[in-house]
């Protein structure tokens, strides 16, 4: 049952994140892209899979390529800009009345 309501995610493109569960636990990386519909993100250097490509006109020899696969955002936490540890985030208004994200542990504004 699809909903028209837009989902609010704690992860955005360009964020530094830490993996909290799975094979890549405790590894960190930068978010390359986010799929809001499926709640997945592609993180640099995380969840590497091996793809076997058939020879085509563009790639005459084919070959084996390692690339990042999407990972569910529930397995990711934002890295605190101050300490580098995993932290939850909150939202608050800054001096100009604009909503900003901040790290709950240190109070540091994210991005």
From Swiss-Prot:
Family named by the database record: Belongs to the universal ribosomal protein uL24 family.
GO terms of biological process kind: translation
One cellular component term from this protein's GO annotations in UniProt: ribosome
Name this protein carries in UniProt: Large ribosomal subunit protein uL24
Xref: InterPro entries: KOW (IPR005824), Rib_uL2_dom2 (IPR014722), Ribosomal_uL24 (IPR003256), Ribosomal_uL24_KOW (IPR041988), Translation_prot_SH3-like_sf (IPR008991)
NCBIfam families xrefs: rplX_bact
Function as written in the Swiss-Prot or TrEMBL entry: One of two assembly initiator proteins, it binds directly to the 5'-end of the 23S rRNA, where it nucleates assembly of the 50S subunit.
MF (Gene Ontology): rRNA binding; structural constituent of ribosome
Species of provenance: Cytophaga hutchinsonii (strain ATCC 33406 / DSM 1761 / CIP 103989 / NBRC 15051 / NCIMB 9469 / D465)
RNA-binding is among the record's keywords: yes
Description of how the protein assembles with itself and partners: Part of the 50S ribosomal subunit.
Keywords: Ribonucleoprotein, Ribosomal protein, RNA-binding, rRNA-binding
Highest taxon in the source lineage: Bacteria
Keyword RNA-binding: yes
CDD domains associated with the record: KOW_RPL26 (cd06089)
């Amino acid at each position: 049952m699809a909903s028209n309501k837009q989902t609010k995610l704690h992860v955005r493109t360009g964020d530094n994140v830490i993996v909290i569960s799975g094979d890549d636990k405790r590894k960190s990386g930068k978010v390359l892209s986010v799929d809001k519909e499926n709640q997945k993100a592609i993180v640099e250097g995380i969840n590497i899979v091996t793809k076997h490509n058939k020879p085509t006109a563009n790639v005459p020899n084919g070959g084996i390529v390692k690339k990042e696969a999407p990972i569910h955002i529930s397995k990711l936490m934002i890295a605190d800009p101050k300490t580098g540890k995993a932290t939850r985030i909150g939202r608050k208004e800054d001096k100009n009345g604009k909503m900003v994200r901040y790290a709950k542990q240190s109070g540091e504004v994210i991005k």
